[in-house]
């Protein structure tokens, strides 16, 4: 079974403030149980409870997906499934959350799982370290009852399969379009896929969706900023036919955009 459900980690403890005179440096009282107090102050207990009960699927843990997953967990979502087969490469370090010199060669899903458990020790986390394509897509989508899905896949065919599978199951989904070859963060937009424009990946995806009768029905995070000339090169890598130049902050911004759609959707604030 490729779906290796992670065991739930122990709860954080409390450290009492150290006694002593006022002039002494005193230890701050730490209470890890209330780490979501600022979120509750913003959203209220009822909506925070909705997030705690929600299960979000994130597929693709590169420059966009890992940021999306972390922001969603930091907002208080209590269950998550993350999926990616890639290991960290040196070329990932300029933009990917899990990529450090010390993590090169390690599985992205495993590294991210450690971060997510450290943020919320009580999270129910499922880690899938396989490429999601063909029949794997249906297996993944049917493995649990999800409340929202994030598509952060950068290859067209598995991206299309995940989107179609989610739509067939009436699973709310947000999809990231191309974050490469762009530098202006103010150009990012969130819209129904039918409203996307001046994004080559979105254009190709729409054409493929039209062939299967899909023209709308999910939000996309994209940027109409023209791609910088010379930022695309062809390559011969597994599951990849090209490499695109990227800057550190645009993929992160796209991931945050995806997270915002998920969080607002789960609490009923997404128009």
Language-model regions, residue ranges each:
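Conserved SAM/SAH-binding loop
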Residues: 129-136
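Conserved N-terminal Rossmann-fold NAD(P)-binding element of oxidoreductases
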Residues: 59-60, 83
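N-terminal charged helix/coil linker that caps or initiates catalytic domains
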Residues: 24, 28-56
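Conserved S-adenosyl-L-methionine
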Residues: 74-79
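Short amphipathic alpha-helix with an adjacent loop that forms part of the alpha/beta core around
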Residues: 136-145
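Glycine-rich phosphate/adenylate-binding loop
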Residues: 29-31, 144-147, 153-158, 168, ...
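Glycine-rich phosphate-binding loop and adjoining beta1-alpha1-beta2 segment
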Residues: 84-119
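Hydrophobic/small residue at the entry helix of a nucleotide-binding pocket
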Residues: 64
